[in-house]
């Protein structure tokens, strides 16, 4: 089976999480400090709303700020969030190889469903798993293990596609085969992702250019052995850097 992250992996959407504070302040006629996006990026929405209220001396209540920020994010996924180049071709190839797929995301299910409906890719996934439902973030393997159990696929037989280092490490330690994908928001961590992941690619089109095994597990009964052999083929073909 295959488990996909969403933001930064399938969708080129990480930028909204750095821009949303600026967008909110602009909407109420306030100019944001240049590094606001970086400051808010590591905060929860609740923490960010409190920071903005206090730092910019806003009269709005924190709950109102939080809801306005959530509305901006929701509109972005409903109307704008784009697919990464080559994503549909990859999903189509996996589906044609009879490989079941699920989503494992830190985002809200509502935003994912809206974006997937607009982009017409919901059909590729059997289910969407979220960290909120799993009861833990991606520093713990719960969401991956739940997704694999749903797929009926052991970790060693399952590919996990991720773009951030902490998620790559978590999935790898849990026994999954991890493919790292480049994203601009995580560019400072790319060397670590290359070292930690089983395989790594700059983009999905790079992967699709090579004769690799996206015919992998799920198309037959070879299971983990099939994936292991195919990952070695990918590495040998130079698609990925370890």
Annotate the PLM regions.
Residues 108-109, 113-209:
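Asp-based, Mg2+/Mn2+-dependent phosphohydrolase catalytic module
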Residues 209-242:
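Small-residue (G/A/S/T)-rich helix-start motifs and N-terminal tracts that mark the onset
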Residues 1-4, 159, 212-214:
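Conserved beta-strand elements of the Class I
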Residues 10, 83, 101-104, 160-161:
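Conserved SAM-binding loop
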